[in-house]
Amino acid sequence: MYGVLLVLHGSKIKEWQDVAIQYANLLRKYFDLVEYGFIEFNQPSITEAAKKLASNGVDTIIVVPLLFAAGTHFKRDIPKQLEEIKGVKIMIAEPIGVDERIAEILKERVEEVLRSSTRS
């Protein structure tokens, strides 16, 4: 059995917690066991979230970073925070990267701004 661990950067701004909850809830439409963890600033940490999945009986944790690029957090910090998780296979998905679907969302945001500016 596997669980999904959504990893977010985190921020001193409280709204990051809300974003994490909303994304985790969206993923729960597709996967039974989903938790979220933050690289820094917010709780739960990546380690805490992984331990919660492990305590629910998963034997594999699929880590999904909500990051755009494979920088230091992806290459160093995420694996380091998962080191103490024993007895569970850890698989880390690639960051979002450059993706046409993201470009579509960005295009929509530009169009929204243009529409709203013509109304003012």
UniProtKB/Swiss-Prot annotation:
Which principal EC class is assigned to this enzyme?
Answer: lyase
Q: Which residues bind Co(2+)?
A: H9, H73
- What taxonomic lineage is listed for the species of origin? Archaea, Thermoproteota, Thermoprotei, Sulfolobales, Sulfolobaceae
Q: Which residues are the active-site ones?
A: H9 (proton acceptor)
Q: List the GO molecular function terms.
A: cobalt ion binding; sirohydrochlorin cobaltochelatase activity
Q: Which gene encodes it?
A: cbiX
Assembly and interaction partners: Homotetramer; dimer of dimers.
Task: Kindly give the CDD domains that the UniProt entry links to this protein.
Answer: CbiX_SirB_N
Catalytic reaction annotation: Co-sirohydrochlorin + 2 H(+) = sirohydrochlorin + Co(2+)
Q: What UniProt keywords apply to this chain's record, in alphabetical order?
A: Cobalamin biosynthesis, Cobalt, Lyase, Metal-binding
Q: What name has this protein been given in UniProt?
A: Sirohydrochlorin cobaltochelatase
Q: Which family does it belong to?
A: Belongs to the CbiX family. CbiXS subfamily.
Alphabetical list of InterPro entries matching this protein:
CbiX-like, SiroHydchlorin_Cochelatase, Sirohydro_Cobaltochel/CbiX
